[in-house]
């Protein structure tokens, strides 16, 4: 399950990332909107889902004409849940609903003519020749629907009588025309009555096939959804993830966050892709401010979540065991509606995660937790959290500025950040800082976002004071800083 509130889902960028998964049918869009999570006991189902998407990727690459044909059909499917439900409950459908069913049957027939696509998608669509015959008794092959004369000899006779009467009306005048109009009204009433009876009989004939039609429409949604996943994977350059055994380490090679990468690219900035391994227990991620910790956490969490949702994650290679839940918590909490402080909200979220983690292995991500309390107690709590999760079967990834001592089950990673020599170089070149935007751009350009493993006792490189001085922070502040030293 996903334990992510709406605000953190937005900050993680999950919904925005999945905008690249472009379903065309109402059925496919519903499947996407469900956020179907595959847990440890659904490994076989997830493996089948990922394999189908993988096969579709190859199909999409090599069969562009068939793909375009399939998309042309998918684009015309409508949401027929109410119509099909009414049919199964013996409700008499109106002409519009009958037209929609005929159109769906016709579209299904066309998809059946692309068997290679259905096979690669691992989708079964059952032929419906009985429905085709009932809805198109003249075998015209048209998409429109009409209550054909073949449905009722009485209806055909009434229509014929009306047609003859209308010819007479063309020449009639006065009282004669008025009498003919009265006759025509009677014929029209008879037609309407007979058409209602015909629709009732026709719906009774269609009703036995309602379940099969419903199954086919669900299959169309699955086809659409898997096809959208395959095309998204191609756009991202993503590969099929490997599913590992419980307790094995998560592996992410050259992973990235597509939304953030697109945003940076749009303003001419580069995004550095990263590689890491997240072992069972606690992983502590450190690094200076502006060093990219939050982006790194978002990107790695997004990849793990997407695997559990049946997508290919945005990485050159990814492998993960299946977790019972994935939880992501950023440093922002919408507390106004609950009447809780930021600290209280964080503790409640951490409490709930721990309750889950005691029962099932989870993947828990905390981005600088407990910033809202004093540093001494926060350091103690964060350190205790790290040690607590170290003994659990899941994974905790913790980004923090607080010290977390080394120990069994605790691993320390660091974003390299700005190297001292590089910082000194730009400060020497430009004694006076450039305009603010240019200064920030230069600092960002110096950042090394690669992830390295460090000894738990290694110092975190810092450049905050030098950067603050270079950016023109009032010298009086530094005088007080020197006094403290």
Language model features: what each stretch is:
Residues 246-485:
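ATPase nucleotide-binding head domains, primarily ABC-like/P-loop NTPase cores
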Residues 62-63, 202-207, 283-287:
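Glycine- and acidic
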Residues 215-261:
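Charged, amphipathic alpha-helical linker segments immediately N-terminal to NTP-binding catalytic cores
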Residues 97-101, 234-244, 478-485:
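Conserved C-terminal helix/linker of AAA+ ATPases
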């Amino acid at each position: 399950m996903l334990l992510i509130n709406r605000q953190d889902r937005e900050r993680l960028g999950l919904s925005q990332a999945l905008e690249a998964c472009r379903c065309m049918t109402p059925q496919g869009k519903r499947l996407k909107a469900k956020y179907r999570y595959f847990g440890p006991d659904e490994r076989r189902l997830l493996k089948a889902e990922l394999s189908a998407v993988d096969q579709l990727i190859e199909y999409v690459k090599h069969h562009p004409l068939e793909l375009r044909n399939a998309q042309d059909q998918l684009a015309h499917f409508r949401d027929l849940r109410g119509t099909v439900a009414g049919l199964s409950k013996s409700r008499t459908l109106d002409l519009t609903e009958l037209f929609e069913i005929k159109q769906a049957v016709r579209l299904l027939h066309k998809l059946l003519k692309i068997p290679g696509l259905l096979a690669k998608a691992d989708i079964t669509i059952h032929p419906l020749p009985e429905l085709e015959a009932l809805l198109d008794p003249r075998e015209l092959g048209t998409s429109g629907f009409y209550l054909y004369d073949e449905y009722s000899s009485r209806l055909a006779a009434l229509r014929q009588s009306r047609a003859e009467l209308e010819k007479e009306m063309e020449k009639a005048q006065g009282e004669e025309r008025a009498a003919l109009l009265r006759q025509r009204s009677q014929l029209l009433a008879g037609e309407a009555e007979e058409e209602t009876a015909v629709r009732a009989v026709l719906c009774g004939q269609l009703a036995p096939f309602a379940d099969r039609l419903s199954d086919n429409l669900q299959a169309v949604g699955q086809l659409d959804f898997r096809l959208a996943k395959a095309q998204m994977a191609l756009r991202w350059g993503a590969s099929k993830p490997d599913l590992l055994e419980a307790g094995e380490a998560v592996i992410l090679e050259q992973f990235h966050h597509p939304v953030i990468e697109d945003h940076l690219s749009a303003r001419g900035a580069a995004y550095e892709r990263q590689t890491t391994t997240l072992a069972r227990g606690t992983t502590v991620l450190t690094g200076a401010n502006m060093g990219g910790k939050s982006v790194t956490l978002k990107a790695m969490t997004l990849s793990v979540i997407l695997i559990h949702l049946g997508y290919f994650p945005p990485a050159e290679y990814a492998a993960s065991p299946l977790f019972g839940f994935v939880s992501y918590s950023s440093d922002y909490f919408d507390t106004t509606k609950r009447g809780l402080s930021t600290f209280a909200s964080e503790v409640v979220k951490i409490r709930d995660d721990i309750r889950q983690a005691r029962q099932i292995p989870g993947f828990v991500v905390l981005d600088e937790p407990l910033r809202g309390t004093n540093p001494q107690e926060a350091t103690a709590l964060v350190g205790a959290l790290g040690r607590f999760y170290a003994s659990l079967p899941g994974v905790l990834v913790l980004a923090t500025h607080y010290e977390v001592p080394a120990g069994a089950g605790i691993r320390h990673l660091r974003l390299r950040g700005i190297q001292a020599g590089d910082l000194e170089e730009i400060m020497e070149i430009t004694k006076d800082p450039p305009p603010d935007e240019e200064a920030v751009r230069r600092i960002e350009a110096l950042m090394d976002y690669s992830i390295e493993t460090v000894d738990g006792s290694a110092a975190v490189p810092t450049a905050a004071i030098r950067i603050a001085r270079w950016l023109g922070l009032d010298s009086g502040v530094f005088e007080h800083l020197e006094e403290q030293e």
